[in-house]
C-alpha cells in the first residue's frame, strides 16, 4: 500500500515514527527542540532494525546471495544473478561459457487473463498451478542447447512450435529442478508452522521459525520466478526468443486446458453447460461453486469444499495434465494444480481486480475469515491512508451482502472524513520534475499535471508570503500530497500540493478545501467501481413509493 517507514512500522510493528508536530516544522524542531530532533532520528533507526528483526529482509537478501553466489546488490536484479548461477553450473561440469550476443528487441505474448464474470459470487475456490513457468521449462526440457532448430523436428513441443531434445537434460531445467525441490520441502514445513500458530496462538519462537522458513522458500521462489524474467530479457547471455515465447504460449495453453477440464467435470456433475470459471490469471483459476454448495452441503461448506477439491477436482486436473503432456510429447509431466483459497463470497470488478472473503488458504483454516484484495484502490499507495483503512472495513460490510448497511457506513465515514485535516485526506504522490513545468509569467505552463501544478503553486506562495525559512520548498523527487480546493481562495486555483507533513496554516487555504470533491475522488469513485459491479448504489435512491410512506 505504501513504502513509507511510518506506514510499514504501523502495519508490521503497531508502532509509528516520533511525532514532532507540537513543536512545529521539521526545521523548527531542529532549532527549538534539538533533543526531540535527535530522538526522531534514533526512533527511525530503531524502527528499521525492529522491522528487519521481525521480517528478516536482510536474511532474505543474504540467503539469495549465498544460494546464487553473487554480491548482495545483484539479488535485486534478474539477469546478473542467473548468469552467475548458470556460470557456476557450467564451470562445475567443465563446459565453456558462451559469449554474450546482441539480440534485436522483440515483443512476445505474456500470460493468459480471462475476462471475469463481473459481480458478486457465493462460494469461490481458487486453484493455482505450482510454479508454472519453472515447471514448463522442466516439462519441455527448455534450454538453449536443447532447442532443435530444424523444421518438423521430433521432440518435446512447446505451444509456439519450438521443439526440444529429450535424450539429455538441459542445464537450465536441471538447475530449476534442484531449486524447486528445495522450495517445496521448505514451504511444506512453513505451512505446518503457520497452522500451528493458528491452532496454538502466536509465540515469538513460532513466529521467528515461520519467518525463517518463509524467507528461505521466498528466496527460492524469487530465484525461480526471476529465471523467466531473465530468459525474456534480450540482454541475457542465454536469451532465445523461441524459448521465451515457448514458455508463455505453453502457459496459456495449460491454463485454458485446466479451465476446460474443471468446467467439463462440473457441468457433468450438475448436468448443465454453465461456465463456472469466474476468472483466470496466468496460473490461477477461480471457480464459482455456490450452486454446488446449495445442492449438496449447506451445513459445513468449507470442509465439504476442501474435501471436494482434494478428492474430485484435483484428480481430474491431474488426469487432464497427464493427457496434455502426452499430446505434446513432453519430456516429463510437471503440471500440478492445487486448491488455494476457499471463500464464501467474492466480487470481481475487472481483470485482476477482486475481493475474496477467505476461510481457508492452502489448507490453513482461519479462526476468522480474512479479506483478500487484489488490484482495488484500497491497496494502492496513491489512495490516502484513512481511505484505505475505511475501504477495508467497507469491504467486510459489502461482503456481508447488505446494501443498506453499506450506504449507512459510507455516510458515516463521509462525516468523519470532513472533520479531518488536509494532510489526512490529501492524495499522496511523488513529483519527479516540477522545474520543467515552471513558467515565469504564469507560475506553471499549460498541460502541467495536477500534483505538479499544486507543487509550483505551493512554492510560489510560500516564497511570496516569506515563509520559505520556516517551510521547505518542494523539490524534484520529493514525496508530496495534493488536495482539491474551492476556487474562491486567494490563488483562484482548484488545487494545492504540500510536503507530506502539513499544509501551512499561514497560506490560509484550509478553509477552502473542497471536502466533497476530495471525498468523491479519493473514496467514492474507487468504491463505486465495486458497487456498480454488484448493481448497488452508494446512497439510497428515492422512488415514488417513498413519497407515500
Locate each region found by the language model.
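Active-site cores of enzymes that catalyze phosphoryl transfer or operate on phosphate-rich substrates
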Residues: 168-236
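Active-site-proximal helix-loop-helix substrate-binding element of RNase H-like nuclease domains
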Residues: 1-45
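Active-site-adjacent bridging/hinge elements
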Residues: 17-27, 100-107, 157-158, 191-194, ...
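A short small-residue
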Residues: 22-31, 162-163, 231-239, 286-295
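A non-catalytic, amphipathic alpha-helix used as a structural packing/dimerization or gating element
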Residues: 36-51, 178, 182-185, 250-257, ...
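Conserved phosphoryl-transfer catalytic core
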Residues: 150-168, 175-177
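DNA-dependent DNA polymerase catalytic subunits
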Residues: 52, 62-140, 144-149, 154, ...
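A residue-level signal for conserved active-site and pocket-lining positions in enzyme catalytic cores
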Residues: 9, 44, 48, 183, ...
Amino acid at each position: 500500500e505504501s513504502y513509507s517507514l511510518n506506514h510499514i512500522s504501523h502495519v508490521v510493528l503497531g508502532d509509528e515514527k516520533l511525532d514532532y508536530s507540537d513543536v512545529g516544522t521539521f526545521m523548527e524542531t531542529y532549532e527549538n527542540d534539538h533533543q526531540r530532533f535527535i530522538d526522531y532520528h534514533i526512533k527511525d533507526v530503531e524502527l528499521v532494525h525492529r522491522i528487519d528483526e521481525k521480517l528478516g529482509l536482510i536474511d532474505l537478501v543474504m540467503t539469495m546471495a549465498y544460494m546464487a553466489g553473487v554480491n548482495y546488490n545483484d539479488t535485486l536484479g534478474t539477469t546478473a544473478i542467473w548468469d552467475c548461477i548458470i556460470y557456476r553450473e557450467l564451470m562445475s561440469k567443465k563446459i565453456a561459457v558462451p559469449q554474450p550476443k546482441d539480440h534485436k528487441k522483440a515483443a512476445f505474448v505474456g500470460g493468459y487473463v480471462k475476462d471475469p464474470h463481473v459481480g458478486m459470487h457465493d462460494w469461490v475456490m481458487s486453484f493455482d498451478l505450482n510454479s508454472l513457468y519453472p515447471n514448463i521449462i522442466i516439462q519441455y526440457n527448455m534450454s538453449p542447447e536443447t532447442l532443435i532448430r530444424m523444421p518438423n523436428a521430433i521432440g518435446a513441443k512447446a505451444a509456439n512450435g519450438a521443439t526440444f531434445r529429450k535424450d539429455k537434460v538441459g542445464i537450465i531445467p536441471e538447475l530449476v529442478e534442484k531449486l524447486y525441490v528445495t522450495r517445496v520441502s521448505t514451504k511444506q514445513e512453513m505451512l505446518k508452522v503457520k497452522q500451528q500458530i493458528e491452532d496454538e496462538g502466536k509465540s515469538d519462537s513460532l513466529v521467528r521459525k515461520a519467518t525463517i522458513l518463509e524467507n528461505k522458500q521466498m528466496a527460492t521462489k524469487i530465484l525461480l520466478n526471476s529465471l523467466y524474467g531473465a530468459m525474456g530479457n534480450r540482454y541475457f547471455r542465454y536469451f532465445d526468443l523461441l524459448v521465451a515465447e515457448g514458455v508463455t504460449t505453453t502457459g496459456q495453453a495449460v491454463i485454458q486446458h485446466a479451465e476446460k477440464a474443471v468446467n467439463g467435470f462440473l457441468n457433468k456433475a450438475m448436468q448443465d453447460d454453465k461456465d463456472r470459471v469466474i476468472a483466470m490469471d496466468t496460473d490461477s483459476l477461480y471457480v464459482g461453486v455456490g450452486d454446488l454448495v446449495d445442492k449438496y452441503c449447506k451445513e459445513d461448506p468449507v470442509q465439504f469444499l476442501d474435501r471436494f477439491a482434494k478428492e474430485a477436482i484435483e484428480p481430474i486436473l491431474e488426469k487432464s495434465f497427464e493427457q496434455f503432456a502426452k499430446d505434446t510429447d513432453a519430456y516429463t509431466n510437471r503440471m500440478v494444480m492445487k486448491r488455494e483459497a476457499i471463500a464464501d463470497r467474492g466480487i470481481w470488478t475487472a481483470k485482476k481486480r477482486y475481493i475474496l472473503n477467505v476461510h481457508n488458504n492452502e489448507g490453513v483454516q482461519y479462526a476468522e475469515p480474512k479479506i483478500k484484495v487484489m488490484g482495488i484502490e484500497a491497496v494502492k499507495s496513491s489512495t490516502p491512508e484513512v481511505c484505505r483503512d475505511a475501504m477495508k472495513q467497507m469491504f467486510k460490510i459489502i461482503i456481508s451482502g447488505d446494501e443498506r448497511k453499506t450506504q449507512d457506513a459510507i455516510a458515516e465515514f463521509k462525516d468523519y472524513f470532513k472533520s479531518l485535516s488536509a494532510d489526512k485526506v490529501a492524495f499522496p504522490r511523488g513529483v519527479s520534475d516540477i522545474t520543467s513545468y515552471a513558467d515565469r509569467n504564469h507560475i506553471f505552463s499549460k498541460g502541467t499535471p495536477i500534483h505538479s501544478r499544486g507543487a509550483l503553486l505551493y512554492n510560489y506562495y510560500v516564497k511570496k508570503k516569506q515563509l520559505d525559512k520556516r517551510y521547505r520548498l518542494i523539490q524534484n523527487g520529493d514525496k508530496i500530497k495534493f488536495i482539491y480546493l474551492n476556487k474562491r481562495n486567494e490563488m483562484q486555483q482548484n488545487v494545492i500540493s504540500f510536503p507530506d507533513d502539513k499544509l501551512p496554516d499561514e497560506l490560509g487555504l484550509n478553509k477552502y478545501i473542497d471536502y466533497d470533491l476530495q471525498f468523491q475522488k479519493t473514496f467514492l469513485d474507487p468504491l463505486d467501481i465495486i458497487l456498480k459491479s454488484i448493481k448497488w448504489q452508494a446512497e439510497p435512491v428515492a422512488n415514488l413509493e417513498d413519497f407515500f410512506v
